[in-house]
Amino acid sequence: MIRPGRCLWQPCLSGRKRSRPSGPVSRHGMMAAMTAPTAAAIRPVQALLVVDVQAAFVSGWEAVPDADRVLRCTRDLLSRARAAGALVVHLQNDGEPGAVDAPHTPGWELHLPVEPGPRERVVRKTEDDGFADTPLGDLLTDAGVTELAVCGVLSEMCVAATARTALVRGHRVVLPHDAHATYDIPAAPGISDTVPAAMSSRAAEWALGDEVEIVPHAAAVPFAAAPRPAVGPAAAPGLPVSPAAPPPSPVR
Protein backbone atom coordinates (compact mmCIF):
# COMPACT_ATOMS: atom_id res chain seq x y z
CA MET A 1 0.00 0.00 0.00
CA ILE A 2 1.28 3.44 -0.92
CA ARG A 3 -0.06 6.53 0.77
CA PRO A 4 -1.96 8.90 -1.53
CA GLY A 5 0.16 11.42 -3.39
CA ARG A 6 3.90 11.85 -3.50
CA CYS A 7 4.43 13.00 0.07
CA LEU A 8 7.20 10.48 0.73
CA TRP A 9 9.32 10.54 3.87
CA GLN A 10 12.96 11.38 3.34
CA PRO A 11 14.85 10.98 6.62
CA CYS A 12 17.21 13.77 7.57
CA LEU A 13 19.66 13.35 10.44
CA SER A 14 19.77 16.59 12.37
CA GLY A 15 22.18 15.42 15.05
CA ARG A 16 19.51 15.81 17.72
CA LYS A 17 19.15 12.79 19.97
CA ARG A 18 16.63 11.80 22.59
CA SER A 19 18.42 12.06 25.94
CA ARG A 20 18.89 8.85 27.93
CA PRO A 21 17.66 8.53 31.51
CA SER A 22 20.30 9.37 34.11
CA GLY A 23 19.16 6.59 36.47
CA PRO A 24 17.20 3.35 36.47
CA VAL A 25 13.78 3.60 34.85
CA SER A 26 11.05 0.99 35.15
CA ARG A 27 9.47 -0.45 32.03
CA HIS A 28 6.23 1.30 33.02
CA GLY A 29 8.06 4.59 33.48
CA MET A 30 9.84 4.28 30.14
CA MET A 31 6.57 3.55 28.33
CA ALA A 32 4.91 6.52 30.01
CA ALA A 33 7.76 8.77 28.91
CA MET A 34 7.40 7.51 25.34
CA THR A 35 3.64 7.98 25.13
CA ALA A 36 2.84 11.15 27.08
CA PRO A 37 3.18 14.38 25.05
CA THR A 38 5.66 16.83 26.53
CA ALA A 39 4.03 19.55 28.63
CA ALA A 40 5.81 22.79 29.44
CA ALA A 41 5.21 26.50 29.66
CA ILE A 42 4.58 27.67 26.10
CA ARG A 43 5.91 30.97 24.78
CA PRO A 44 4.04 32.59 21.89
CA VAL A 45 5.05 31.70 18.34
CA GLN A 46 5.21 34.17 15.44
CA ALA A 47 4.19 31.88 12.58
CA LEU A 48 1.97 28.92 11.75
CA LEU A 49 2.94 26.40 9.07
CA VAL A 50 -0.11 24.49 7.80
CA VAL A 51 1.26 21.41 6.04
CA ASP A 52 -0.62 19.80 3.13
CA VAL A 53 -4.17 20.33 4.43
CA GLN A 54 -5.43 19.45 0.96
CA ALA A 55 -8.72 17.90 -0.08
CA ALA A 56 -7.22 14.49 -0.89
CA PHE A 57 -5.88 14.01 2.63
CA VAL A 58 -8.64 15.48 4.80
CA SER A 59 -11.89 14.81 2.91
CA GLY A 60 -13.54 11.92 1.12
CA TRP A 61 -12.70 8.24 1.28
CA GLU A 62 -8.92 8.78 1.24
CA ALA A 63 -8.87 11.15 4.22
CA VAL A 64 -6.66 10.36 7.20
CA PRO A 65 -8.65 8.69 10.01
CA ASP A 66 -8.40 11.73 12.29
CA ALA A 67 -9.16 14.33 9.62
CA ASP A 68 -12.05 15.88 11.55
CA ARG A 69 -9.88 16.48 14.61
CA VAL A 70 -7.01 17.90 12.59
CA LEU A 71 -9.34 20.25 10.72
CA ARG A 72 -10.98 21.44 13.93
CA CYS A 73 -7.61 22.12 15.58
CA THR A 74 -6.17 23.73 12.45
CA ARG A 75 -9.13 26.08 12.16
CA ASP A 76 -8.58 27.12 15.77
CA LEU A 77 -4.86 27.70 15.18
CA LEU A 78 -5.56 29.70 12.02
CA SER A 79 -8.13 31.90 13.71
CA ARG A 80 -5.86 32.81 16.60
CA ALA A 81 -2.73 33.18 14.46
CA ARG A 82 -4.52 35.62 12.15
CA ALA A 83 -5.97 37.58 15.07
CA ALA A 84 -2.50 37.96 16.61
CA GLY A 85 -0.85 39.08 13.36
CA ALA A 86 1.33 35.98 13.08
CA LEU A 87 2.63 34.86 9.69
CA VAL A 88 0.51 32.03 8.23
CA VAL A 89 2.03 29.80 5.55
CA HIS A 90 -0.01 27.11 3.80
CA LEU A 91 2.21 24.41 2.29
CA GLN A 92 0.65 22.74 -0.76
CA ASN A 93 2.11 19.52 -2.11
CA ASP A 94 2.39 19.07 -5.89
CA GLY A 95 1.94 15.33 -6.42
CA GLU A 96 3.14 13.45 -9.45
CA PRO A 97 0.85 13.09 -12.49
CA GLY A 98 -1.95 10.69 -11.63
CA ALA A 99 -1.59 11.14 -7.88
CA VAL A 100 -4.55 12.26 -5.78
CA ASP A 101 -2.75 15.55 -5.12
CA ALA A 102 -1.52 16.19 -8.66
CA PRO A 103 -1.62 19.94 -9.38
CA HIS A 104 -4.96 21.44 -10.39
CA THR A 105 -6.94 18.31 -9.52
CA PRO A 106 -9.72 18.39 -6.89
CA GLY A 107 -7.55 16.55 -4.36
CA TRP A 108 -4.74 19.09 -4.72
CA GLU A 109 -6.86 22.05 -3.62
CA LEU A 110 -6.31 23.53 -0.18
CA HIS A 111 -9.22 22.46 2.01
CA LEU A 112 -9.26 25.56 4.23
CA PRO A 113 -9.68 29.08 2.81
CA VAL A 114 -6.66 31.35 2.48
CA GLU A 115 -7.23 34.91 3.66
CA PRO A 116 -5.60 37.65 1.56
CA GLY A 117 -3.28 39.99 3.38
CA PRO A 118 0.35 40.83 4.14
CA ARG A 119 0.79 37.99 6.64
CA GLU A 120 -0.59 34.97 4.78
CA ARG A 121 1.09 33.00 2.01
CA VAL A 122 0.79 29.77 0.03
CA VAL A 123 3.98 27.87 -0.79
CA ARG A 124 3.92 24.98 -3.25
CA LYS A 125 6.39 22.13 -2.87
CA THR A 126 7.39 18.87 -4.52
CA GLU A 127 9.28 17.31 -1.60
CA ASP A 128 8.28 16.29 1.92
CA ASP A 129 10.38 19.11 3.35
CA GLY A 130 8.54 22.40 2.95
CA PHE A 131 11.89 24.21 2.81
CA ALA A 132 13.32 22.18 -0.11
CA ASP A 133 13.50 24.30 -3.27
CA THR A 134 10.80 26.68 -2.01
CA PRO A 135 10.75 30.28 -0.73
CA LEU A 136 9.64 29.19 2.77
CA GLY A 137 12.98 29.89 4.42
CA ASP A 138 13.18 33.36 2.88
CA LEU A 139 9.59 34.12 3.92
CA LEU A 140 10.36 33.31 7.54
CA THR A 141 13.64 35.23 7.50
CA ASP A 142 12.14 38.30 5.82
CA ALA A 143 9.29 38.35 8.35
CA GLY A 144 11.74 38.04 11.25
CA VAL A 145 10.18 34.78 12.44
CA THR A 146 12.24 32.77 14.92
CA GLU A 147 9.47 30.77 16.62
CA LEU A 148 6.76 28.79 14.83
CA ALA A 149 4.11 26.10 15.15
CA VAL A 150 3.53 23.27 12.68
CA CYS A 151 0.30 21.36 11.97
CA GLY A 152 -1.19 19.25 9.18
CA VAL A 153 -0.52 15.93 7.45
CA LEU A 154 1.16 13.46 7.18
CA SER A 155 2.78 13.21 10.60
CA GLU A 156 5.79 11.04 9.77
CA MET A 157 6.31 12.49 6.32
CA CYS A 158 5.81 16.14 5.39
CA VAL A 159 5.01 17.38 8.91
CA ALA A 160 8.11 15.72 10.38
CA ALA A 161 10.41 16.68 7.49
CA THR A 162 9.36 20.34 7.63
CA ALA A 163 9.59 20.52 11.43
CA ARG A 164 13.02 18.88 11.37
CA THR A 165 14.45 21.36 8.88
CA ALA A 166 12.97 24.26 10.84
CA LEU A 167 14.87 22.98 13.89
CA VAL A 168 18.08 22.63 11.89
CA ARG A 169 17.67 26.22 10.70
CA GLY A 170 17.54 27.37 14.31
CA HIS A 171 13.82 28.00 14.69
CA ARG A 172 11.97 27.18 17.86
CA VAL A 173 9.30 24.66 16.80
CA VAL A 174 6.03 23.85 18.59
CA LEU A 175 4.07 20.79 17.43
CA PRO A 176 0.53 20.41 18.83
CA HIS A 177 -0.18 16.71 19.32
CA ASP A 178 -3.82 16.96 18.27
CA ALA A 179 -3.19 19.06 15.15
CA HIS A 180 -1.39 16.53 12.93
CA ALA A 181 -2.32 13.07 11.66
CA THR A 182 -1.48 10.26 9.26
CA TYR A 183 -2.74 6.90 7.98
CA ASP A 184 -2.53 3.44 9.53
CA ILE A 185 0.64 1.59 8.60
CA PRO A 186 -0.48 -1.65 6.93
CA ALA A 187 0.58 -5.02 8.27
CA ALA A 188 3.77 -6.49 6.85
CA PRO A 189 4.09 -10.30 6.99
CA GLY A 190 6.88 -11.34 9.30
CA ILE A 191 7.44 -7.76 10.45
CA SER A 192 4.41 -6.31 12.22
CA ASP A 193 0.66 -6.16 12.45
CA THR A 194 -1.15 -3.00 11.34
CA VAL A 195 0.17 0.02 13.21
CA PRO A 196 -2.67 2.42 14.11
CA ALA A 197 -2.36 5.93 12.74
CA ALA A 198 -2.29 7.45 16.22
CA MET A 199 0.77 5.37 17.15
CA SER A 200 2.53 6.34 13.93
CA SER A 201 1.88 10.02 14.64
CA ARG A 202 3.25 9.70 18.16
CA ALA A 203 6.35 7.89 16.92
CA ALA A 204 6.92 10.72 14.43
CA GLU A 205 6.86 13.23 17.29
CA TRP A 206 9.30 11.17 19.34
CA ALA A 207 11.71 10.82 16.42
CA LEU A 208 12.10 14.61 16.18
CA GLY A 209 14.20 14.60 19.35
CA ASP A 210 14.36 16.80 22.41
CA GLU A 211 14.35 20.25 20.86
CA VAL A 212 10.86 20.19 19.36
CA GLU A 213 8.17 21.34 21.82
CA ILE A 214 5.29 18.88 21.70
CA VAL A 215 2.16 20.10 23.45
CA PRO A 216 -1.02 18.06 24.00
CA HIS A 217 -3.54 20.52 22.60
CA ALA A 218 -3.53 23.09 19.80
CA ALA A 219 -5.70 25.35 21.96
CA ALA A 220 -2.73 25.85 24.29
CA VAL A 221 -0.46 27.32 21.58
CA PRO A 222 -0.28 31.14 21.92
CA PHE A 223 0.58 33.46 19.04
CA ALA A 224 2.31 36.81 18.71
CA ALA A 225 2.63 39.14 15.74
CA ALA A 226 5.39 38.44 13.25
CA PRO A 227 8.00 41.22 13.50
CA ARG A 228 7.49 42.18 9.84
CA PRO A 229 4.95 41.46 7.07
CA ALA A 230 5.89 38.83 4.52
CA VAL A 231 7.69 40.15 1.45
CA GLY A 232 6.04 39.66 -1.95
CA PRO A 233 2.46 39.69 -3.25
CA ALA A 234 -0.34 38.78 -0.87
CA ALA A 235 -2.24 35.55 -1.36
CA ALA A 236 -5.68 35.61 -2.94
CA PRO A 237 -8.13 33.05 -1.53
CA GLY A 238 -7.19 29.60 -2.79
CA LEU A 239 -4.49 30.84 -5.16
CA PRO A 240 -0.81 30.00 -4.59
CA VAL A 241 1.32 33.10 -5.11
CA SER A 242 4.77 31.76 -4.34
CA PRO A 243 6.95 30.62 -7.24
CA ALA A 244 5.79 27.16 -8.20
CA ALA A 245 8.22 24.45 -7.25
CA PRO A 246 9.89 22.69 -10.18
CA PRO A 247 8.00 19.76 -11.72
CA PRO A 248 8.53 16.43 -9.94
CA SER A 249 11.34 14.32 -11.31
CA PRO A 250 10.09 11.20 -13.12
CA VAL A 251 12.68 9.09 -11.27
CA ARG A 252 12.66 8.69 -7.47
Swiss-Prot record:
- Which Gene Ontology terms describe the biological processes this protein takes part in? response to antibiotic
Compositionally biased tracts (Low complexity): 230-242
Which keywords label this protein? Antibiotic resistance, Hydrolase
Disordered: annotated segments: 230-252
EC annotation from Swiss-Prot or TrEMBL: 3.5.2.19
Active-site residues, Swiss-Prot/TrEMBL: C158 (nucleophile)
Temperature-related activity data read: Optimum temperature is 55 degrees Celsius.
* Comment on pH dependence: Optimum pH is 7.0.
Ranges annotated as biased composition (Pro residues)? 243-252
- Is the Hydrolase keyword given for this protein? yes
Show the Gene3D superfamilies listed in the entry.
Answer: Isochorismatase-like
What the entry lists under InterPro entries is as follows: Isochorismatase-like_dom, Isochorismatase-like_hydrls, Isochorismatase-like_sf
The GO molecular function terms of this record are: hydrolase activity, acting on carbon-nitrogen (but not peptide) bonds, in cyclic amides
What reaction gets catalysed by this protein?
streptothricin F + H2O = streptothricin F acid
Instruction: State the family it belongs to.
Output: Belongs to the isochorismatase family.
* Role according to the record: Catalyzes the hydrolysis of the amide bond of streptolidine lactam, thereby conferring streptothricin (ST) resistance. Can hydrolyze streptothricin-F and streptothricin-D. However, this strain is believed to be a ST nonproducer, which raises the possibility that its true role may not be its involvement in self-resistance to STs. May catalyze the hydrolysis of naturally occurring cyclic amide compounds that are structurally related to STs.
Q: What is this protein called?
A: Streptothricin hydrolase
Which species expresses this protein natively? Streptomyces noursei (Streptomyces albulus)
Q: Which taxonomic lineage is given here? A: Bacteria, Bacillati, Actinomycetota, Actinomycetes, Kitasatosporales
